[in-house]
């Protein structure tokens, strides 16, 4: 069995800015700190939580109609993806790292749902990131709130 990989994308706001939730990978600060000591079951639980939140946010705005085209696009753009996770997680990686270089989302096997079809990909990507961070922070505050507030230090 392949070891569970870190979701880190190299821009950790928990260590650099003191955020309770990383703006990059969406892990909680204590998960970032303790990641290397977690067993594969614990790591998978973290990834599963993040995957569900990503699918919830992206699935309300975008539809993947061709997973093979999405894979080809990811490979062409050299964007890594974890085949054990939902294609919506792959799409999230693509948008996070490459949205400014995408002219036609349909070439990647993806289309915006009707209510978002008139929104630029940059604006949509920013909305997705903002909503995802808010959802992750709400989950953190609900279950792991730090003394004294909103989870930010």
Predicted regions mapped to residue ranges:
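N-terminal cysteine/histidine-rich coordination modules
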Residues: 1-63
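C-terminal, charged low-complexity interaction regions
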Residues: 101-153
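Exposed alpha-helical structural elements
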Residues: 7, 42-45, 69, 90, ...
């Amino acid at each position: 069995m392949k070891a569970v990989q870190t979701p880190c994308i190299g821009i950790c706001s928990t260590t650099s800015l003191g955020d309770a939730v990383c703006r990059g990978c969406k892990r909680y600060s204590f998960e970032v700190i303790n990641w290397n000591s977690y067993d594969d079951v614990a790591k998978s639980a973290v990834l599963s939580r993040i995957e569900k939140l990503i699918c919830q946010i992206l699935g309300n705005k975008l539809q993947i109609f061709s997973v093979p085209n999405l894979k080809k696009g990811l490979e062409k753009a050299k964007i890594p993806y974890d085949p054990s996770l939902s294609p919506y997680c792959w799409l999230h990686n693509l948008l996070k790292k490459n949205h400014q270089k995408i002219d036609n989302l349909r070439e990647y096997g993806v289309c915006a749902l009707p209510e978002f079809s008139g929104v630029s990909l940059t604006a949509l990507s920013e909305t997705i990131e903002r909503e995802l961070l808010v959802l992750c922070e709400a989950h953190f505050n609900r279950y792991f709130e730090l003394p004294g507030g909103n989870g930010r230090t």
